[in-house]
From Swiss-Prot:
Its EC number is 5.4.2.11. It is an enzyme of class 5 (isomerase). The active site is at H11, E89. Substrate binds at residues 10-17, 23-24, 62, 89-92, 100, 116-117, 185-186. This is 2,3-bisphosphoglycerate-dependent phosphoglycerate mutase. The lineage of its organism: Bacteria, Pseudomonadati, Pseudomonadota, Gammaproteobacteria, Enterobacterales. Homodimer. Catalyzes the interconversion of 2-phosphoglycerate and 3-phosphoglycerate.
Amino acid sequence: MAVTKLVLVRHGESQWNKENRFTGWYDVDLSEKGVSEAKAAGKLLKEEGFSFDFAYTSVLKRAIHTLWNVLDELDQAWLPVEKSWKLNERHYGALQGLNKAETAEKYGDEQVKQWRRGFAVTPPELTKDDERYPGHDPRYAKLSEKELPLTESLALTIDRVIPYWNDTILPRMKSGERVIIAAHGNSLRALVKYLDNMSEDEILELNIPTGVPLVYEFDENFKPLKHYYLGNADEIAAKAAAVANQGKAK
């Protein structure tokens, strides 16, 4: 049976991950640790014999630079790449820039957990005159006002990620090309929920660690057979737990 593999990588630690701030569509770069995580992901993929024909990423530099570092380690810096806002992190609305632990102290751990992980829960909206509104950013100049979020739930993130998967990424895989996606915690959670047919309760508890390759294997009908992280299982579990704990009061 022919098996097709897909590799997903959440960007390495960003400067705002390090500072425990809600990031969303704010274009913050990788921290030094994040660069190291991205390089380590590339080395792991090389050791496991992976190479690719095409890459996808968002229009945010923490994902783009993660992909650069991964491909550099694979000696595939030349690889064609498509960047799409549809793979951006979920938009965190008026929470963007706020410290997660301080927000939890103000509103409670459970409220922040729902804002971070709830399926249909949207954080407080931005206003269009807010400098954080994506309509002020030239990279989104071709998007309609309807497409520009003031805030997003995971459900709304799914509404942009999954059509992009079905219309753009999956057809390329079906043509026989080997694909890697470097994206974000919530855009990848959106895809994982869809691929694994997870319930809303199950997705609430899913935390994707930074800079760890997640491999999906598909059968000839492109139904997922299994998935697994590359790397040390204990270290990966600890990183996922750290992601979960970011939204708790100190």
